[in-house]
Design a protein with these regions (language model features):
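Short, glycine/proline-biased beta-turn/loop segments that scaffold the active-site neighborhood
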Residues: 90-122
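Bacterial peptidoglycan biogenesis and beta-lactam-recognition machinery
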Residues: 40, 44, 85-99, 150-156, ...
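N-terminal secretory signal peptides and thylakoid transit peptides that target proteins
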Residues: 1-15
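Active-site SXXK
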Residues: 71-102, 292
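Beta-lactamase-like hydrolase cores
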Residues: 20-71, 319-322
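Structured C-terminal helix/loop/strand segments within mature extracytoplasmic catalytic/sensor domains
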Residues: 26-34, 212-328
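Active-site-adjacent helix/loop patches that line small-molecule binding or acyl-intermediate pockets
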Residues: 26-30, 106, 121-201, 217-218, ...
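Second-shell loop/turn segments in exported
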Residues: 64-71, 115-121, 129-133, 141-146, ...
Length: 328
């Protein structure tokens, strides 16, 4: 099986026409710089930037193809984190996180797990440790541990209740891989079966209607704008824990300039013929919040496409640099 990569990219289709609104000082210039940074990239791209109006600054809104559902890979892990913390929402949530032991064994082992390193580690770990591994290192075994604790149906119920209709999560990362490989029993796909499938081809597209990791730029901006402000939590202590974990996101040091408080979890995939990159975030900069999502899905025959990945990251850094300059 082709490697699943947190740093990959995904694709599909021609670039769609875009709709843009931009308001605020330098709005038209910012629009050109942000959208222009991504011009020429292959496949389908989507972007949204929203900075709510403040007492002294008008709203900034820039969108491109923001309502289209695309593959976002591990960026769905922020949904899982949020729902699980909602379930634990209480003034003593920090104690609950450190006191909840989660099983680390073959029932949850998955590929691309650099922290829990299956099959070499077994036992129990605290739920906090699993959450941090899921966000900081995008560990898929940790993800399946937290997803099991939350319940995939509960995560889907949360997304539906929040109006995030373009967002979808699988039963587990391992079930997702089983479906990609065409396993008839993908919902009960075992670690042994996954290991035995190492050289088998991908037969189902990562973006599908059965087991996928998907969202839209609209949904991601809505989710980040609401979750980091505490809309989904009843207790301030839970919001603190959510922000603490999300501030560990592995994409932050890869893409974002210094100077802001960033809460983000990126995602991607690289398989032969299909690639994706997604970076959503909430950023507090110069006493102002902005919310951002940039997604690209594309097709390339090779298992990896480092040239397009490098172009996307350069575009992302240029766009974020322009946004930081505008808000600072």
């Amino acid at each position: 099986m082709q490697a699943f990569s947190r740093r990959g990219v995904i694709g599909g289709g021609a670039v769609a026409p875009f709709a843009v609104q931009a308001r605020g000082g330098g709005g038209e210039s910012l629009r050109r710089r942000v959208l222009g940074a991504f011009r020429g990239l292959p496949g389908t791209r989507a972007l949204k930037l929203w900075a709510p109006a403040t007492a002294s600054e008008p709203e900034i809104l820039i969108t491109e193809n923001a309502d289209q559902q695309l593959f976002i890979g591990s960026a769905i892990k922020s949904f899982i984190l949020c729902e699980r913390l909602r379930q634990l929402d209480a003034p003593d949530v920090a104690t609950k996180l450190t006191g909840n032991p989660l099983a680390l064994d073959a029932s949850v082992w998955s590929v691309d797990s650099t922290i829990f390193n299956p099959p070499n580690l077994t036992g129990t770990v605290s739920e906090r440790t699993a959450m941090e591994a899921m966000i900081l290192h995008s560990d898929n075994t940790a993800t399946d541990m937290v997803m099991r604790a939350a319940g995939p149906a509960k995560v889907r119920d949360f997304l539906a209740a929040a109006g995030l209709a373009a967002s979808a999560v699988p039963e587990s990362t391992r079930s997702f891989f089983g479906y990609l490989l065409g396993a008839p029993d993908y919902l009960t796909f075992t670690w042994a079966e996954l290991v035995a499938s190492a050289d088998k081809p991908i037969v189902n597209s990562p973006l599908n209607e059965v087991q996928t990791l998907a969202s839209s730029a609209d949904d991601l901006v809505s989710f980040y704008a609401r979750s980091v402000q505490g809309e989904f939590f009843g207790q301030p202590e839970t919001l603190t824990q959510y922000r603490n974990v999300l501030a560990l996101g592995d994409v932050i040091r890869l893409a974002f300039p210094l100077g802001g408080s960033v809460f983000a979890k990126g995602g991607s995939i690289d398989v032969a013929g299909f690639h994706a990159l997604c970076v959503p975030a909430a950023v507090f900069l110069n006493r102002r919040w902005f919310y951002f999502a940039a997604i690209i899905n594309w097709y390339a025959k090779a298992e990896t496409d480092p040239q397009t990945v490098a172009r996307y990251l350069a575009a992302l850094q240029a766009a974020l640099g322009a946004i930081y300059e505008e808000i600072q």
